[in-house]
UniProtKB/Swiss-Prot annotation:
One of its GO terms (biological process) is regulation of DNA-templated transcription. Residues 77-111, 173-206 are annotated as: Disordered. GO terms for molecular function: DNA binding; DNA-binding transcription factor activity; zinc ion binding. It comes from the Eukaryota. The keyword RNA-binding does not apply. One of its GO terms (cellular component) is nucleus. Residues 185-206 have a biased composition (Polar residues). CDD domains: SANT. Residues 175-184 have a biased composition (Basic and acidic residues). This is Probable transcription factor At5g61620. It is found in: Nucleus. It comes from Arabidopsis thaliana (Mouse-ear cress).
Length: 317
């Protein structure tokens, strides 16, 4: 039995034709070139090397557009642009953009005002409503940040270690916040009320009323003085008259005058000095009612009286 040998024609990997291989192919790419030890040797002028570095998160079809963008940014070197991007395994250690990304990841510490607002929201809304606390009380933080801050706060409170620890923002507890609010309310209630602006300045007596001051100074004559009836004029003496141009002898009842002592002691009422104009008529009526006459002279000598009775004697009828 004779074995038949079957010869299979070789197919070129470059052009796809049979009868030759890629090394001896004269069609397409390897025209006028020879491949020696895996390297194509061609008589064509030397071209700039193509950048074949693998980009991260990019498809191979967009490499040309990316190179054009890198050249337009001013780098001018496509190889340097590819090296700057790096690979996935490199991370952001050797990348120029790594420092910026690392700074963005760095958190911003909480301030004391934010922590106190967090305590107020925790007191009103309770545990678990981190979204409501972030929305209504700590608007500068996200709900995730509020939840993380609350977790650290409760861990700090539950630690029973009595060793000296560094002062932290979490040492401000909810009881301290309530005590601060209570002290602020007490301070606001102790402030004196504002007096209305008027033309007359009122006396300021702190902690004492007028009755208390009067009781304290009981021995002083603080009552109103009684008004006595003036003496009527006799024997055509002119009565005391008012002098309108002199302020001592009259008082204007239309304008009340209030005197205030610096110690707060009330001052007695002002009493006008003088006599009314209708006083002479009242005095004449009083003289008519009394009926007293005063005569000075020698009395009439009675008959049969001794000389001892002849001396000057004043008789009142």
């Amino acid at each position: 039995m004779v074995k038949e040998t079957v010869t299979v024609a070789k197919t070129c990997s470059h052009c796809g034709h049979n009868g030759h291989n890629a090394r001896t192919c004269l069609n397409g790419v390897n025209k006028a070139s020879v491949k020696l030890f895996g390297v194509n040797i061609s008589s064509d002028p030397i071209r700039p090397p193509e950048v074949t570095a693998l980009r991260k998160s990019l498809s191979l079809g967009n490499l040309d557009a990316l190179l054009a963008n890198d050249e337009s940014n001013g780098s001018g070197d496509p190889i340097a642009a590819v090296d700057d991007t790096g690979y996935h395994s490199d991370g952001q250690i050797h990348s120029k953009k790594g420092k910026t990304a690392h700074e963005k990841k760095k958190g911003k510490p909480w301030t004391e005002e934010e922590h106190r607002n967090f305590l107020i929201g925790l007191n009103k809304l309770g545990k678990g409503d981190w979204r409501g606390i972030a929305k209504s009380f700590v608007s500068t933080r996200t709900p995730t940040q509020v939840a993380s801050h609350a977790q650290k706060y409760f861990i700090r409170l539950n630690v029973n270690d009595k060793r000296k620890r560094r002062a932290s923002l979490f040492d401000i507890s909810l009881e301290d916040q309530k005590e601060k609010e209570r002290n602020s309310q007490d301070a606001s209630t102790k402030t004196p009320p504002k007096q209305p602006i008027t033309g007359i300045q009122q006396p300021v007596v702190q902690g004492h009323t007028q009755t208390e001051i009067s009781n304290r100074f009981q021995n002083l004559s603080m009552e109103y003085m009684p008004i006595y009836q003036p003496i009527p004029p006799y024997y055509n003496f002119p009565p005391i008259m008012y002098h309108p141009n002199y302020p001592m002898y009259y008082a204007n009842p239309q304008v009340p005058v209030r005197f205030v002592h610096p110690s707060g002691i009330p001052v007695p009422r002002h009493i006008p000095i003088g006599l009314p104009l209708s006083q002479p008529s009242e005095a004449s009526n009083m003289t008519n009612k009394d009926g007293l006459d005063l005569h000075i002279g020698l009395p009439p000598q009675a008959t049969g009286a001794s000389d001892l009775t002849g001396h000057g004697v004043i008789h009142v009828k």
